[in-house]
Amino acid sequence: MAYQSEYALENEMMNQLEQLGYERVTIRDNKQLLDNFRTILNERHADKLEGNPLTDKEFQRLLTMIDGKSIFESARILRDKLPLRRDDESEIYLSFLDTKSWCKNKFQVTNQVSVEDTYKARYDVTILINGLPLVQVELKRRGIDINEAFNQVKRYRKQNYTGLFRYIQMFIISNGVETRYFSNNDSELLKSHMFYWSDKQNNRINTLQSFAESFMRPCQLAKMISRYMIINETDRILMAMRPYQVYAVEALIQQATETGNNGYVWHTTGSGKTLTSFKASQILSQQDDIKKVIFLVDRKDLDSQTEEEFNKFAKGAVDKTFNTSQLVRQLNDKSLPLIVTTIQKMAKAIQGNAHLLEQYKTNKVVFIIDECHRSQFGDMHRLVKQHFKNAQYFGFTGTPRFPENSSQDGRTTADIFGRCLHTYLIRDAIHDGNVLGFSVDYINTFKNKALKAEDNSMVEAIDTEEVWLADKRVELVTRHIINNHDKYTRNRQYSSIFTVQSIHALIKYYETFKRLNKKLEQPLTVAGIFTFKPNEDDRDGEVPYHSREKLEIMISDYNKKFETNFSTDTTNEYFNHISKNVKKGVKDSKIDILIVVNMFLTGFDSKVLNTLYVDKNLMYHDLIQAYSRTNRVEKESKPFGKIVNYRDLKKETDDALRVFSQTNDTDTILMRSYEEYKKEFIDAYRELKMIVPTPHMVDDIQDEEELKRFVEAYRLLAKIILRLKAFDEFEFTIDEIGMDEQENEDYKSKYLAVYDQVKRATAEKNKVSILNDIDFEIEMMRNDTINVNYIMNILRQIDLEDKAEQRRNQEQIRRILDHADDPTLRLKRDLIREFIDNVVPSLNKDDDIDQEYVNFESIKKEAEFKGFAGERSIDEQALKTISNDYQYSGVVNPHHLKKMIGDLPLKEKRKARKAIESFVAETTEKYGV
């Protein structure tokens, strides 16, 4: 069967959307788009306009108010009412989207709209709601990688989406067999924010035809935009909810409004439960018969992270209360339909102020409980239940309690909340790419067999803690972590947590790290945190210290490292600072290893945390919660969460995964074996060699299709290498995998050269190439130790007296530059080469290499600006002003740019603007580090 062309796919979709209820209209350019918008605006506001449609002046006045805004501001205008002054000085309010009666909006569809701004573009399918282009569909023919459609959207958005196209809320991309949707934003569009649509049972709806049938029906689409897109006020971005979040909210609302029963939602850790539960709370708080919605969290969870998250979804959602009287006032305030508080504070309010809350014995109240397995097993829940007689309770959890892992009183989650309203399990989340799978290692630290703390088959008198914490074993584990940490964390690009069995163990490990760290060329940044008891049991004098003393030392070490001023009197502030620190990326000063007992193992999210070291016993929900700290999606260089167990937790891991994925097949959750990846590598390597037998033959490829085949083949190989490197048995040798590291570096250099070539061609020419939208996944190629700082360190070590040694240093730098994969370093490559070839040989031992390089860069930058300005006949100082603005804002000032270019013919003006924007962006990156 011949493949379906892009044109045929587009035509098929247009026909289907027409059948679903969209009016098919012909809109070919921006003028027709504005005319159509104006017509519908007049129709929808006929009553308010009283038979007098908007005049040209009035419409122009409106466009001035709504045009030229950011995507974020446009999204707010779309959902708001806008006052418009008429020519007779009267005022009317215009609305652009009916966010409550979704079906009352006007739905149209058009295709092949042409726009011409900096670049020409023609869009595939545009969905108009009330005349505004709110959804843009970009299609690729079957067999083309869907990421190419994503990259095309990124290109269009950067180059073409202006005017009313700033109101696009959502993009849909498809190649016919695979379909995704994602929200529009001012900031960089991320692949991790592309979502699959699915049915209520989490079965993926992939084909474009099925997707349109389920997702794109007019009322459903308006509902998605109105109800299930969130305006994140803190980050100033639009967020689209995922299908399982939508279904959970719908099920909960139905249960709350149509029955008097309780229920719970089981969504795996890391799947965005906070957003789901908050959205449900928000919608329920708008119901007339529900007097109050109370969002309950556990005390330890209402930290800065939770407050931050809630306030993102609705500004001012969390009014932090420091005493129960404030909470009582909030409960009695009818203007506050939604309250966020802790279970502990609520129980206290009832105990001391029950007479002030009498109305709640009859008023309907809905409690939404986040992470209900932590906060709802206990006396406080019973106390709240006794007072709020007409209340419904809805729990959210990632790890429910079942008979095998029930609470201390034997109750399960179902015993407390009743029916499970919706599930989204860890296997579903991994399949959809919403969380990562796990790579789990078990390191045996005993010669005979792995010992378990509860293992009584050993000699009965054995002191198991003494065995686990024997000096020799603690040092063995610590050395293993030190020796492998860089490999596990991709040269410290990521952070890690080390969880141990007790405070005593934490202190011992911290002190061992501190001692061994002194011998390292690049010491690890290790921090520790725990909660001490004021009156501690000294275990019959066995422990010769109070744990507070040891924590004080850890905090003092931390203060020296990070220039802070914490103490054991300010442990909350210390906790919050550590929390932010573990979330920092590679370029920031950060913690490499955080040692904990239980803290940070639940409810803590950090995308840059990828490794968990374990030296304690974990089971069921505790195990899954701890493992899940590592599996937040970040970028291509983080393919899984790495778990390193120093105890034999194989059975516990399998049992936990079986319970929480509801399957005996754990292969979808755990990484495959080394041998499987090795076989996959050999097949991919063979395929690469068939396309280009040697790296230098890449230079001979003339055909773009062939070059694309090379890029795709090497990209696949690089992905497999990334996974192989996680295994201890991996060796990058010909004997082991048929390829050595040098050959891989040579292929990688050619791959990056193609990337540079495409990037340069895209910036310089208005030319469409099949390589323009290919996904190079550059982050995956990076080796974060080989960057600009690394090269500068080598430069500083150049021996300026010994010329022979100097030549060796220069040659070393040249070799490194030839294989550079850091983007900034690749930009500086020619500069550094010129510096070591022309400047270094003339230096003497008294010269400061750092200062000499700064001077050299300054001269080169000055020459580059002078040359570009002269070549283009533009003002050099004005160019520098634009560059300085860009350095701080990341945006080329359009007013300054327009003034600089002056009056040129349209085509020349477009060409000049593009050249200046490219020059400013590249020189800023090149000279900015």
From Swiss-Prot:
Miscellaneous remark of the record: Type I restriction and modification enzymes are complex, multifunctional systems which require ATP, S-adenosyl methionine and magnesium as cofactors and, in addition to their endonucleolytic and methylase activities, are potent DNA-dependent ATPases.
Pfam families associated with the record: EcoR124_C, HSDR_N, SWI2_SNF2, T1R_D3-like
Lineage per the UniProt record: Bacteria, Bacillati, Bacillota, Bacilli, Bacillales
GO molecular function per UniProt: ATP binding; DNA binding; type I site-specific deoxyribonuclease activity
UniProt catalytic activity: Endonucleolytic cleavage of DNA to give random double-stranded fragments with terminal 5'-phosphates, ATP is simultaneously hydrolyzed
Organism superkingdom: Bacteria
Residue sites binding ATP per the record: T268, T269, G270, S271, G272, K273, T274
Record SMART domains: DEXDc
Catalytic EC class: hydrolase
Assembly information from the UniProt record: The type I restriction/modification system is composed of three polypeptides R, M and S.
Family: Belongs to the HsdR family.
InterPro entries assigned to the protein according to its UniProt record, in alphabetical order: Helicase_ATP-bd, HsdR_RecA-like_helicase_dom_2, P-loop_NTPase, Restrct_endonuc_type1_HsdR_N, Restrct_endonuc_typeI_HsdR, SWI2_SNF2, Type-I_R_enzyme_R_subunit, TypeI_RM_Rsu_C
Organism of derivation: Staphylococcus aureus (strain MRSA252)
Gene: hsdR
One example of a Gene Ontology biological process annotation: DNA restriction-modification system
E.C. number: 3.1.21.3
Function: The restriction (R) subunit of a type I restriction enzyme that recognizes an undetermined sequence and cleaves a random distance away. Subunit R is required for both nuclease and ATPase activities, but not for modification. After locating a non-methylated recognition site, the enzyme complex serves as a molecular motor that translocates DNA in an ATP-dependent manner until a collision occurs that triggers cleavage.
Name assigned to this protein: Type I restriction enzyme SauMRSORF196P endonuclease subunit
